[in-house]
Amino acid sequence: MNISPYRTRIKFCGMTRVGDVRLASELGVDAVGLIFASGSSRLLTVSAACAIRRTVAPMVNVVALFQNNSADEIHTVVRTVRPTLLQFHGEEEDAFCRTFNVPYLKAIPMAGAEAKRICTRTLYLKYPNAAGFIFDSHLKGGTGQTFDWSRLPIDLQHPFLLAGGITPENVFDAIAATVPWGVDVSSGIELQPGIKDGDKMRQFVEEVRRADGRRLFGVA
């Protein structure tokens, strides 16, 4: 696994309110995630997503999350919401993911026995065009459950985000243990699904910066 000499990127996922997105931008978050997966408690309509999209600050990535959505649904989101990244949590194959001419991230579930068989070479063969990977506890995401970080593939050359039960209380240790390119949080900064907590958002960012300070400069 690569040891990044750079700061840890931060993605806040499951955003549903304009005010939460504005605060995320003010805190210096690198990306916000908008969910279009059917059945999610954080599901957005296209019109609601467009309203949120208009409030996103420059230099902040907008990530559209899908899980086994139809190509037509994804094309509509790409055309109207204009995400800078796509994120796939279902059974989508590489050929499908790259159909939309937008860089994509592939989520890899890590909680079950299937995770024991994941290896770096397999990921590269299955998703050769992925911009990066998200290692989450479950396929659906947003469960608030962690997984055994020692299961992460070794010698991974692509950027990867650590997700699954990441909170302000454990993100410092998570970064120290796995040195991810980025961390992805949803339920860990919420009052309830889709409703973010400003204090938790601030604390999460502070803990990531503290972890980077320790890792890069040896300061707490």
Curated annotation (Swiss-Prot):
Similarity comment text for this entry: Belongs to the TrpF family.
Ranges that cross the membrane: none
InterPro entries registered for this protein in UniProt: Aldolase_TIM (IPR013785), PRAI_dom (IPR001240), RibuloseP-bd_barrel (IPR011060), TrpF_fam (IPR044643)
Highest taxon of source: Bacteria
Keyword annotations from UniProtKB, A to Z: Amino-acid biosynthesis, Aromatic amino acid biosynthesis, Isomerase, Tryptophan biosynthesis
Keyword Amino-acid biosynthesis appears in the UniProt entry: yes
Identification of the protein by name: N-(5'-phosphoribosyl)anthranilate isomerase
Pfam families assigned to the protein according to its UniProt record, in alphabetical order: PRAI
Coiled coil: none
HAMAP family hit by this protein: PRAI
Catalytic activity, reaction form: N-(5-phospho-beta-D-ribosyl)anthranilate = 1-(2-carboxyphenylamino)-1-deoxy-D-ribulose 5-phosphate
Documented EC number(s): 5.3.1.24
Top EC class for this record: isomerase
